[in-house]
Amino acid sequence: GRDCLTGVDRNTVAGIYMASTSFPFQDRQNAGIVADALNLSTRIQTLDISSSQRAGSSALLTALQSVRSAEGPILVSASEKRRARAASPLELTTGDGAAAVLVGEGEPIAHYIGGHTEAVDFVDHYRGEGEAFDYNWEERWVRDEGYMKIAPNAINNLLDKVGVSAQDIDTFCFPVAMRRVASGLARKIGIAEESVADNLQSRCGETGSAHALVLLVHALEQAKPGEKILVAGFGQGCDVLLFEATDAIKAVGDRLAISGHLANGRPENRYTRYLSFNNLLTMERGIRAEVDKQTGLSTLYRNKGMSQKLLGGQCSDCGTCQFPKSKICVNPDCGAIGSQVDEPFADKAAKLNSYTADRLTYSPDPPTYFGMVQFEGGGRLMSDLTDIDPAVELEVGISMRMVFRVKDYDTLRGFRRYFWKATPQNDTH
């Protein structure tokens, strides 16, 4: 979402639609958490869309249909972190991922031509209430009766509706892990085989309800003006959306998008660490892991500007920035009382002033790194450090950026608390 909103006035955003089948909360609006992390206005519509692998494409379609009556653009974000049993086929083909697009009127990078939905209660897999893992049906039946019958019907209906020939499609995005399914669909519909988009199976895996948006964003990265992009989402039916890239695609700006984030990835070749991170092993975590991590909800709400939005303060008298915000200005030459106005720190450039690695305190990924982060323009924060490559030595003075991450898991009550952590600023950022 932050990458998508680069260069966008966040006060103009009128809504955020979140899509996932692995939301962290069942009865707390997850889109509201993301809205806070993005420091969006409270005068927006927030919506969670779930319960299907086409939740991402459905969220995008819903936003496109409702944006004309909205008071501004709508951010559509899809994310997924599904659990898979160890050594299962799903573990081999799926991955965690997210993507976001901004939908609105004006001068878009891609013009929406039209969309179509076929709702079919075709159960290729399911995850029942209280279950941690998906139950999957036989793959050949899913391919022959699902992908090869339901999807072509939806795609042909859309092409007939908008008056576009299958031969005019330049990029066909179909989110499926099975090899040759997308190319088989293309042949059946009449789309050129070279127009079939890479499903990114070798780079990130199939990212569930987010994968339609992941493929769409990846296609937009490579699109040229006038090219038509057909994207589908499959799950208890099929969503199909058709876009045409505009001249604005050439000036999209400096964003990481899908390629940049994949380039920032760090391979993990130790399988037991993967199992541990995904709670697929019963681990001895030691007595230091037995701390009660209950979150006081009243305290969380009182401090949510600081904890979820990373808002500090700026003195309206002398201009000094500080974190956290306080009643009295920290500038010894000022000391003004009640002069602080909100100052967002999440996107500020920062440097690492000092750091340490603690091997005594509990961490699921030891050691625990933390250090003093100095923000450009003023303000300091003693912060947890994350995504530290043990093969690359930290250095005082390196550039840092802030990322929104889980701070604590309260396993006794099923609550997770978020906060901001610092991570090294890679060149690709």
Map each language-model feature to its residues.
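Conserved catalytic cysteine-centered active-site region
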Residues: 21-73, 183-215
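Conserved active-site "lid/cap" helical segment
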Residues: 1-14, 119-170, 181, 185, ...
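Active-site pocket-shaping loop/turn-to-helix segments
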Residues: 1, 47-54, 90-92, 132-153, ...
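Conserved hydrophobic positions within beta-strands
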Residues: 350-352, 385
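Condensing-enzyme catalytic core mediating Claisen C-C bond formation in acyl metabolism
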Residues: 84-145, 149, 224, 231-300
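Short nucleic-acid-contacting surface segments enriched for D/E, G, S/T with interspersed K/R
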Residues: 387-402
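OB-fold/S1-family single-stranded nucleic acid-binding modules
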Residues: 403-429
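Cys/His-rich short segments
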Residues: 289-349
